[in-house]
Amino acid sequence: YSSAASDVYKRQVIDLGAGNLASQLSWIYYYLKPSFDKVNPLISKRLRHELQVRILDTYMNEDHFWWMAFHLKPGGLVNNWNPWCNFNVLQCFFLLENDRDKLAKAVYRTMTSVDHFINYTHGDGGCEEGPSYWGHAAGKMYDYLQMLSDGTGGKVSIFDQPIIKNMGEYIARSYVGNGWVVNFADASAKGGGDADLIFRYGKATGSPLMMSYAAYLKSLSDKDDIPSGDPFRLFQTLLSREELEGRSADYQSPSYSWYPETEFCYMTNKNGFFVATKGGYNNESHNHNDVGSFSLYLNTMPVFIDAGVGTYTRQTFSSERYSIWTMQSNYHNLPLINGVAQRFGSEYKATEVQFDPKHMYFSANIATAYPEEANVKKWIRSYRLGKNTLKIEDSFSLDRAERPNQINFLTWGKVDISVPGAVTVEVNGEKV
C-alpha cells in the first residue's frame, strides 16, 4: 500500500461515462439555473463547481488520457473515444465557460485532439470498427464538428473536406438490406444507423447518398416515433426532422464501394448478390484476424457470414482476446495453411491488394498475414462477381507442405453434401 495509491481517489477522470453525464448536467445547468436559484442557490453553485473541477479544469490541465492522443506513438490507436469524449467536453465549455480567452484555448485544444482521430482515419473514410460503431465514431465526429461550426458562427468548419464526406458515406455503403449490414471486426450484423443523424451529416457534407439513405431508413420506422438521444442530437433532430420526412426514399445500394486505403471492397449485381471482402491488417480497431475474408449475401440474406463478436467480457479486451474463437482466422472464411492460422499484429497484413471495378474482381496476397511457421511464399485469394456467380480462387506457393491445407467457410445455413463434388447451402429459401 503506497502513498501514491492512497491519492488515487483524488484524481479526476474523463471517460465516456463522465463525459456523457457532464454534458447532460451542463445542459441542465444552462437551462435550469434560474429555477434552481429560486429553490436554493447552492444547487447551481455546487453543480457548476463540480463541472469545473471534474471536466473543465481536468481537460485543460491533464494530457495523459489515452483518447486525447496527445502522446500518440507510431502505430498507436485512435478510436471512437476521441471524438465522443471531445464532443462531450466541447459541450461543457460552450455551455459553461464565459471567459472568451479561456473558451478559445479550450476549443483549440479539442480541435488539436480531434485532429488525431481524423488523421488516424484513412482518407477513403472506411470505419475499421464497423457500422454499429459508426454512430460513435464518425457520428460523434459529426456532432463535434457541427457544434464547433455552430459555436464559431461557421468560421471553423471542415465539412467541405473529402475525408469527412467519405467517413459519413461509409454507413450508407455498408448497408446490405433488410436490416443487414457488413459486420467485419466487432460490429453487429444488424443495424443501419440513426436516420436523423445520417440525414444531418449528409446535408452538411452535400451527400445525396446519405440523405436518400436516411430517408429510406426513416420510411421503415414508426412515423410517430419520438426523437431521442443526448440533448444535442435531440435538439438537432427537432430542427431537421420535418425536412427529412419530406425527402423521397430513393436509396439504392451502390454497384460497388472500394476503400483503397482501408482495403474494404463491396460488390453487388442486379441478381441480388452482395459481396463484402477485405484486405487490411491484423491490428485494426476492434480487430479480428480476418485478412482476406469475405461475406456473401443473396437477396439481402447472409449466406457466408462473419460470426462477429459475442458478449463483451474481461477476456475480450485482454491478452486473451485471440483465444476467443470468433477472433481467430480459422473461424472466418479463410484457409488454415499447413495447419497454421493468421497471427495478431500490425505486421500481419495483406499485400498486393487490388480491385478492378470493370470486372468486379478483388484480390490480395494473404500469405503475409500468416506467421513464418505456415511456410507459405504466396497465397493469392481472389473474388470475382459474375451475373449469377461468385468465383473464389486460391493460388498459392508453399516453401514446403507439412499438413493438408484447410479451406474454411462459415455459414448458418443448411449444408447438403449428398451430391458428389457439390455443396449446397440453403438459408431461409436462398440456395448457393
Language model segments and positions:
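Single conserved hydrophobic/aromatic residue that forms the stacking wall/gate
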Residues: 1-5, 9
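Active-site lining segments of carbohydrate-active enzymes
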Residues: 11-130, 239-248
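Long, repeat-rich segments with strong aromatic
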Residues: 96, 100, 107, 111-152, ...
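Generic, well-ordered alpha-helical scaffold segments in large soluble proteins
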Residues: 24, 92-95, 113, 144-151, ...
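Non-catalytic C-terminal accessory modules of carbohydrate-active enzymes
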Residues: 153, 240-431
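Carbohydrate-active enzyme catalytic cores, enriched for enzymes
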Residues: 136-304, 355-357
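A residue-level signal for conserved active-site and pocket-lining positions in enzyme catalytic cores
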Residues: 89, 171, 394
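Short alpha-helical "patches" and their helix-cap loops
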Residues: 36-45, 101-108, 151-164, 420-425
